Amino acid sequence: MISDDFDISGFSLKEDELVPTTGIKINLNVKDSIENKSAFRFVDATASKNANLDNLIVSSGTTDEENPDNSTYKEYELNPKFDKDTLNYELELLENIDELNLKPILSDTKSSMKLKKPKRDEDGNLVYESDGVIVEYEELDIQNNVSTTVKLNELGKGDTNLTITVTAEDGKTEKNYTLVVKRPYGVIRGSIFLKPMESKKIYKATVRLYKSDEVKNVIDWSTVKSGKRDSIHQQLEKITSLDSDTNDDGTFEIYVTPGTYDILLDREGYLDHIFISRTINNGDVLDVGEKELYAGDVNKDGVIQLLDLSMLYSAYQTDTTSANYDKKIDFNDDGRIQLLDLSALKANYEVNRIIE
């Protein structure tokens, strides 16, 4: 006979009238007992100690059921592969996305969950402790089999550490599942100045990054000839790009996921400067140096010539109050199209776009 103690505090007794009588008497404690001619059965009311997850689905994008071709939904495989008894996971993300969706699936639906994630302010910026280095965290309740969107730390700002705490029905048993989202990155930096606007201290431009493989589907760079008018700029506008404005002094430093990129230095009314097929590995720093952007390519066809001059003359001596004022011809940003703009275009006449 087994003499080990057995906790029956979570059990109750219920009379069962559908089975033969037994005449057994059960003493629950000194005062209470059950004695009945009919049989009885135990009812287990013990709270569950199951604090397991059956699965953790990490995804991005959305599903379009009406037009599946428009769906962007994608699931990611964790390292190691998910198992209820494995508590620590990593995900290396090689995409330029800002958010991930977490969908935890409970083993016991009577359990509850909380998600601990980096804290952000109303503008979506990371909140740091008083030392300005350590990131603050916050907790929120999350639901079983429901996706929760998590904003990721920006490239260069460290891993995104997430913890899902599962509390069993008994309120005591807990399991902490951690997910560390790693975002490898490299850096592209450089500076630009606008010719001939150096004396005006005008440096602002936009740096546009394109995945080289996507550009190759649209543009064959081997066929592009210097000094020939083309629609390269307009074709690039149709391709998804990662855009960053330069600082006020023309410098820029952009964090990117490893890959091969085409880089466009762009400002309205100025000749483009393009770099093609630049590969960035994890930890790389690509410095493109200081580059000039030349005022005068009003129609963005890669050459400053007669068509641009004609467009300037058509808006000559107009200002921001005029109906035909065109900001892209106002090269020095003074709100007027006049002699300074004409002089800038003539100084750069017949200059061609540069592709490196």
Protein language model annotation of sequence segments:
Residues 214-251:
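Short, acidic Ser/Thr/Gly-rich low-complexity loop/linker segments typical of extracellular
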Residues 99-106, 258-268:
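A short, solvent-exposed beta-strand micro-motif common in secreted/extracellular proteins
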Residues 189-205, 210-217, 299-305:
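Structural motif
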Residues 1-185:
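Beta-rich interaction/scaffold domains
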Residues 301-323, 334-355:
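Alpha-helical segments with a strong preference for the paired helices of cellulosomal dockerin domains
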Residues 268-296:
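Structured interaction patches on ligand/partner-binding surfaces of diverse proteins
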Residues 295-299, 326-332:
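Acidic, divalent-cation-chelating loop motifs in proteins
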